[in-house]
Amino acid sequence: MGLLANNAEVVGGSIMYRGEDLLKKTEKEMQEIRGKDIAMIFQDPMTSLDPTMKIGRQIAEPLMIHKNVDKKKAWAQALEILKLVGIADAEERINDYPHQFSGGQRQRIVIAIALVCYPEILIADEPTTALDVTIQAQILNLMKELQQKIETSIIFITHDLGVVAGMADRVAVMYAGQIIEYGTVDEIFYNPKHPYTWGLLNSMPTLSSTKLEAIPGTPPDLLDPPKGDPFAARNPYAMKIDAEKQPPFFKVSDTH
């Protein structure tokens, strides 16, 4: 998204979108993509909205910038998407300010802003973390419904495996900033191959067990990453070579 501070540095890899590397785009080129083709929902809805601006204007603004529509048409489309995300009395509430909404309502508004231009990719960064369990379920159901209506792809960033099971088609498990296992949701949950994935699944509470298994040790310091496999020190199945070299990333099936 190109939203990090100027002193942030990408040390390797690429971010491919439509056959082009986003890391090579200028800020002006990214402004044409950001919010239009790729949108993002941030973690905390309480701080994601401008407190001095009516929510209708905040929803309409991306349309005026990216779709080149006039204010009246943008406002009408903002009202339509506000109804779509389930804000009651949208005709009146479109003129309200963020502080007049609850946390769950603010997250719905943030989702409306992200989806108003019908992006191809929606990045959702822990979008339900700051919400209570009941509102979490409502927001997740809303996102699944909107995904089908708008036909957008969602990259869902979360530490909640229950959310993963309910939302995902494919899952990338990350450890120390690296993808260590990738597959369909069924493969990850029912046929995991990496010891870290085993540890995550074993740490989930179940009705059939009274004991939770914890992964031993602590995560590595990413400012001073260890040589070799970053999970080796916590992996009871690690070999000596893992302390020296990264294990290869290999396929066990067409999708895993």
PLM-predicted stretches and their roles:
Residues V10-D21:
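Conserved ABC transporter NBD signature motif
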